[in-house]
Amino acid sequence: MTAQVDRYVSFKGIDWVGRSREIFARLQSHIDQANSPFWPYFTRQRKLAHSQGLDDLRVLHNYLPTLRELLENMGDLKTLGMLEELEQICM
């Protein structure tokens, strides 16, 4: 049996899970409004990523440019700031 490697060992002391959760909680209102074809796609890709054992930090990282553009266009500077802070710390 091989040992499980923690790929986030360098994030010790950083609540990246909580930060990712907070960002997704804020994104949920945009997802629910579905004013862009991106949101249903993004939701499907998140479910697929989870089924492959990937976490929300990875999902956010994969869609960072698109999320940044959408949040800027919607004027959601709070969520954009949270996403950019997470990017600086963990991505």
Curated annotation (Swiss-Prot):
Say if the entry is tagged with keyword ATP-binding: no
Q: Which GO terms describe its biological process?
A: nitrogen fixation
Keyword NADP belongs to the record: no
The protein depicted here goes by the name N(2)-fixation sustaining protein CowN
| Role, per record | Is required to sustain N(2)-dependent growth in the presence of low levels of carbon monoxide (CO). Probably acts by protecting the N(2) fixation ability of the nitrogenase complex, which is inactivated in the presence of CO.
Q: Which InterPro entries match?
A: CowN
Q: Which family does it belong to?
A: Belongs to the CowN family.
Organism annotation: Beijerinckia indica subsp. indica (strain ATCC 9039 / DSM 1715 / NCIMB 8712)
What does the UniProt keyword field contain? Nitrogen fixation
